[in-house]
């Protein structure tokens, strides 16, 4: 190719390249404009996207909260599954994850999260309860861990001020029942054979556990659920304090406990005794009073004790479950027995109106019911019968059976009952067998010696023991002495009926037995007293009128034609013959009570109709005229009347 062609080509190429460069420049300018426009569009888009992202962030926050609640629910269910598998440590770790979850700013979400945290803490405490009551060794470390968890729960409740789940009070109440359960198989008045060391540890834990919630008692408010929770806390603290002092110090009759009892039973404007207390609290009050009687043979606050018995019996009667719990029935029957025994010592009028043997029958049945319930509880083993309470129940049953058997035609040996057979061979039953034999044979001094072998019962069963002595003396008087002697001095009878040298029988005691036997128509043999010579005559041959002028002899002095003796009799005649029952029926003591006897005398005195006196001239003459020293007797009457004036 020639140079011109080459130059042309170069020229054309250069032109093309120039054109391309020009076009490139034009395109660059266009691109700059487009970039500016694009940047402006992008900035607007960025703003829109930022707003959208902010909106999505806010929406994502609530979605995240929803997811947290779902997560808490899943973790909670997993923890409960592990709990059912008895994998307590792993379950506790899962519940702790819920408790330590982050709290967000949304009020609604916080409330939901707080609810889950509260439920997780409740489950942690209940897990600990299962570990505590099933773990044999190393329980002390576990107790400290539970108290730490309890402190966490207490602080959490103070922080949220109960402003969460409406069931918070019920959940707390249930938790208190789990960690501070009822003591149904041990009694405050029967702790001789309990494992004290183990029980003190449990009671001490319950006391420290409930102390963590004392602040709730100071929280004001009239919410029924809050007041119910406060009542439960107050009750649990009272029970723990009483048990702790009983096990450690032995004495529960302190000002501290007395003040707590006053708070527990006091009626106020918000609630009554029945509303403030339930079966558990009244059960503890009854045990407290039973223990008081066991120590002193006396109940100081009888009114409150009776109120507790009635309320306790009413609660049990309304529930078939409660009526089948042997522990509760033992407390109920023991309370009733103690109240009757204390009433006898106090001469309670309400019990004075009750027939004596009916009351003894009631006591015997209740003693037997207690023995049956103790048998069901497995507490009639020989090792248990050494306690004061078991001796009290066994002896009470045997003693009341002896009293009733003495007047009954059906002779049922109390040692034949299955509940007594279980204890045969124990020292207390051997002593009771000797007591029963001596009573049956009316060996009074040996009877006293046998009863003296159980001195711990001489106070709590003093009333029944004195009844046994009195009944034994009465039976010996009528079954042995009266049938053997026709005449015997009072002093000789007293020596035969002597129980012991320390418990001497007096002359008045013997006369009381004789007079009561007449009034109750229990004198087997007719007897007559000669109090001038202190002699007692036994036998029907002594049925002779004591006055020299019997009513038959007085009637013989009246002529057959004088039929209207009452009309013609003078006042002094009437007073004389009335003493020998000529015109009026005599007032008899037999078959009458003391009250009936004196009422009859009063009625005779007030309603007597005096005869008309026709002749007043011989009023100073004492009739019948043949009576010796009648004039002297009249002088004595006048002298007495003058002195009375």
From Swiss-Prot:
InterPro entries hit by this protein: PCI_dom
Compartments it resides in: Cytoplasm; Nucleus
Composition bias type Basic and acidic residues, residue spans: 46-63
Coiled-coil portions: none
GO biological process: adaptation of signaling pathway by response to pheromone involved in conjugation with cellular fusion; cellular response to pheromone; conjugation with cellular fusion; protein deneddylation; regulation of protein neddylation
Alphabetic keyword roster: Cytoplasm, Nucleus, Signalosome
More details: Present with 1320 molecules/cell in log phase SD medium.
Protein known as: COP9 signalosome complex subunit 10
Organism expressing this protein natively: Saccharomyces cerevisiae (strain ATCC 204508 / S288c) (Baker's yeast)
